[in-house]
Amino acid sequence: MPTTALTGIGQLVTNDPALGEGPLGLRRDAAIVFEDGVVAWVGDSAHVPATDTAHDLDGRAVLPGFVESHSHLVFAGDRAEEFAARMSGRPYGAGGIRTTIEATRAATDEQLGANVRRLLDESLRAGSTTVECKSGYGQSVEHELRSVRVAGRYTDEVTLLAAHVPPPEYAGRVDDYVAMACAEMIPRCAPHAKWIDVFCEQGAFDRDQAHAVLTAGIAHGLVPRVHGNQLHRGPGVQLAVEVGAASVDHVTYIDDADIEALAHSDTVATLLPGADFCTRNSYPDARALLDAGVTVALGADCNPGTSYTTSLPFCIALAVRELRMTPDEAVWAATAGGARALRRGDVGVLTPGARADALALDAPSHLHLAYRPGVPLISRVWREGTLAYATN
């Protein structure tokens, strides 16, 4: 098989302490070899084995490709006017998730697919090489089915967000919607998805309703995820731990009992600071979670209403500035942490046998991601060993 070497790496983030310094497994003056889509060798530039091709990175930092474990990409339209109203403190009665449900239902499959492809290309340019993609803007059997099918054209990490908000036709009949989702939607959509998700929050679905949807998904072979504790202290975190969810996302309003439950579970706390930034919400207490030993991931939460960004570098900068994470913690959370949230061991790391997903910065160190917010530092991206994006 053809082999490719990246040499002259000023700083290599492996995320394997056995390969370098600290939790990020940092190596200096390093090299890495890709073969047949995976990492074949990691070591010093001075000792790199012979390869078919080699690229000198001239002192740039190299990291694992970012792992985006939370995105809502299957939608139509935008909510820019709603955003402007929110920022100016004006009421905007036409806004909300239901606006996007209406636009998404009206769009063709081709239009939805083009939007997913556009946003995935944007994510790639920002360094994301693995992207989870949710449905959730259909909220009917027909429209959720086509949403997961559209998502499945572009990613293996498809989530059926079967309970986002009750659609207009189920106003005042949330239990009826849940019964429909469990009896009809989930059985039809499960063959096209990997994950089942719910929005467990006041104004959306309560604990019992969310539990019913998650257990129905589990019965059809889907692995649970939970949107929880975004707007209020509620049952989302405890429910996620109870059902063995891979991740509970947002976790903005939590207490000591929630932190303790997460610390004694395999459920990852996925923080989405872009949503808090764009809504002027409080930020989650990342420091308390990390200090308690909770596994933390970072996601961009790309969606048209509350976080219309695909940039994990931006979220890393927010995490360091607003969530009081260290630069090392934030980079780990956006790479290995995201992989943990997707229960993946082959991405988010640059170790022999891992998938050859990597990015190079126009900077000598990963610290520059938080140090230089808003600067487009991603200069090259490799996916499965193939150069997928380059600035020049």
UniProtKB/Swiss-Prot annotation:
Disulfide-linked positions: none
EC category name: hydrolase
Organism (species): Nocardia farcinica (strain IFM 10152)
GO cellular component annotations of the record: cytoplasm
UniProt keyword terms in alphabetical order: Cytoplasm, Histidine metabolism, Hydrolase, Iron, Metal-binding, Zinc
Residue positions binding Fe(3+): H70, H72, H227, D301
Keyword RNA-binding included in the entry's annotation: no
Role of this protein: Catalyzes the hydrolytic cleavage of the carbon-nitrogen bond in imidazolone-5-propanoate to yield N-formimidoyl-L-glutamate. It is the third step in the universal histidine degradation pathway.
Gene3D superfamilies named among the record's database cross-references: Metal-dependent hydrolases, Urease, subunit C, domain 1
Positions of N-formimidoyl-L-glutamate binding: Y137, N303, G305
Cofactor binding, note field: Binds 1 zinc or iron ion per subunit.
Chain sites annotated for binding 4-imidazolone-5-propanoate: R79, Y137, H164, Q230, T306
Family of the protein in this entry: Belongs to the metallo-dependent hydrolases superfamily. HutI family.
Record protein name field: Imidazolonepropionase
EC number: 3.5.2.7
Domain of life the protein comes from: Bacteria
InterPro entries recorded: Amidohydro-rel, HutI, Metal-dep_hydrolase_composite, Metal_Hydrolase
Any GO BP: L-histidine catabolic process to glutamate and formate
Gene name of the record: hutI
An example Gene Ontology molecular-function term: zinc ion binding
